[in-house]
Regions:
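Beta-alpha-beta core module
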Residues: 5-6, 52-99
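Secondary-structure junction motif
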Residues: 2-3, 17-38, 102-110
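Alpha-helical segments flanking ligand/cofactor-binding loops in enzyme cores
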Residues: 11, 55-56, 107
Length: 118
């Protein structure tokens, strides 16, 4: 029923089977925070470790999931739906050796992901 929408409210997933990441996943605390903030207690049907596996189970119509916007989901038979009441961002950091020469490919990658070289 959700797939006909381009946007939904977070409340719309509360009564659906919810597929989420395991508690040791980097994204799980953010998902839990979003649900807690919205006072939503979904029925967790599965806790999985890999993005592709979460997407695969959603693609087999076994539940819904909150996932990061990643290209891997474009390869799966699922529809990404924007959740209207989520306005969260996650910051990622990249570590590298400071006092070394940076290759052209490295600098282009930094520019592509829009971050600063320190």
């Amino acid at each position: 029923p959700l797939a006909k929408n381009d946007e939904i409210d977070l409340k719309q997933i509360e009564d659906l089977p919810f597929i989420t990441f395991t508690k040791n996943s980097g994204i799980r605390p953010m998902i839990d925070h979003l649900l807690e903030k919205a006072k939503i207690h979904p029925h967790i049907s599965m806790e999985l470790e890999e993005d592709e596996v979460v997407g695969g189970f959603v693609g087999h119509d076994l539940g819904v999931a909150i996932v990061p916007d990643m290209a891997v989901y474009d390869l799966l038979p699922i529809k990404k739906i924007k959740i209207k009441d989520i306005d969260e961002k996650q910051t990622f950091y990249m570590a590298y050796l400071k006092n070394t020469q940076k290759s052209k490919a490295f600098l282009e990658f930094i520019e592509h992901v829009n971050c600063d070289v320190l």
